[in-house]
Design a protein with these regions (language model features):
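Terminal amphipathic alpha-helical/low-complexity segments used for targeting or macromolecular assembly
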Residues: 1-105
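Structural signal for interior beta-strand "rungs" in well-ordered beta-sheet cores
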Residues: 100-123
């Protein structure tokens, strides 16, 4: 079954989706989040001068909030209570070289959710 079909089928019953969701759905959501993170897919893109929203990708993001529990996150300057699955991972564990390769500056204590693609600014 395609990722799009898995997500669209789950969306029809979104009120019943919880952290106990079946693994196929979790895998589909996590794959889309990973694809967003890498830039392989986008929730919306401009095609022939028209902005097209990819509904199944938007739905996958929303469903991800239903399959992960709230968590307490502690940082050096603050703590947060949020759906941590997207806050963990974008730059967690990055080295100086990883940051330089990514090409963006990130001020201390600024979380960047995992599903966000950050690209170099071109001037």
């Amino acid at each position: 079954m395609s990722l799009e079909k898995i997500i669209n089928d789950a969306w029809e019953n979104k009120d019943q989706i919880s952290p106990n969701a079946d693994q196929e759905l979790k895998d589909a959501i996590n794959q889309i989040i990973a694809d967003l993170d890498s830039g392989a897919v986008r929730a919306a893109e401009k095609i022939n001068d028209q902005w097209i929203a990819h509904q199944h990708i938007k739905k996958a993001i929303m469903l991800s909030f239903r399959i992960y529990p709230m968590e307490n996150l502690n940082g050096p300057y603050s703590s947060w209570y949020d759906k941590a699955h997207l806050l963990k991972g974008k730059t967690a564990g990055w080295t100086k070289e990883d940051h330089e390769k990514a090409g963006f500056r990130m001020v201390p204590n600024s979380p960047v959710r995992k599903d966000h693609l950050l690209e170099r600014m071109r001037f």
